[in-house]
Amino acid sequence: MAAVVEVEVGGGALAERELDEVDMSDLSPEEQWRVEHARMHAKHRGHEAMHAEMVLILIATLVVAQLLLVQWKQRHPRSYNMVTLFQMWVVPLYFTVKLHWWRFLVIWIFFSAVTAFVTFRATRKPLVQTTPRLVYKWFLLIYKISYATGIVGYMAVMFTLFGLNLLFKIKPEDAMDFGISLLFYGLYYGVLERDFAEMCADYMASTIGFYSESGMPTKHLSDSVCAVCGQQIFVDVNEEGIIENTYRLSCNHVFHEFCIRGWCIVGKKQTCPYCKEKVDLKRMFSNPWERPHVMYGQLLDWLRYLVAWQPVIIGLVQGISYILGLE
């Protein structure tokens, strides 16, 4: 039977010694958390001025880092995107190993292995004809899974806040942990796959020759050829396809459904792959059930900074505080 512990913050050094003498093995997890919380308060008592300095350092570092990142992205977008992608891929792995999140580690290894294979196929020259569709189908699949996972996680969190978890006799902390975990999985892999898809989209499109980041395309586009994958289009725009339909943009260029969805939604491209005319996503995806996918993609872009750069900035702040002797 776990002992009942009353934790009171106060009493100076005597109270701190009493907290150090508490046997944590006899306490429940909640009581252990209370003791650790009281120890932290006792340790940092009287450090208000020091804590104010640390807050100022944090604010200043965040402002300076944000300005530097914006300038870097504007002046050297390619290197910024590559470093951000590497940060997105590696930083969570450190916390996974440190905190023993083995389930996340298994999923991360599987995702990394398949994505590495797909990326390898996308960067080969000459490009195999089936590679573009393979790449876009894989990333579109991950995009839909991450989208659904994020929605389920968000609903679980909201149900917990409204107390609906009690109808199923589920503890609030268990329901909240489940919802937050699903939300994290959906958002993290949603951001990561979009960055990989954008990189592969640029490389494949420039290799095929119908697209170039700067300048004119190196090949002339036929009316019956998809500029994303370079394959023949057999289904008319007005016909209903068995596997996929054919889409026509406002510039009158036609594409395979999976290709243009991968290019615009997953690959984050807002222009025609051939003529670079602005793409009207609302017109192309007229079904109202498809529009949340576009808004979800914009949400993932906002979260990229939080996942990739926030841990680095926090680590930098901790390093500055350590050098200055702040605790």
Swiss-Prot record:
InterPro entries: RNF121/RNF175, Znf_RING, Znf_RING/FYVE/PHD
Family the entry assigns: Belongs to the RNF121 family.
The name this protein goes by in its record: E3 ubiquitin ligase Rnf121
UniProt-listed GO biological process terms: protein ubiquitination
Species of origin: Mus musculus
Membrane topology of this protein: Multi-pass membrane protein
Domain of life: Eukaryota
UniProt gene name: Rnf121
Entry keyword annotation includes Iron-sulfur: no
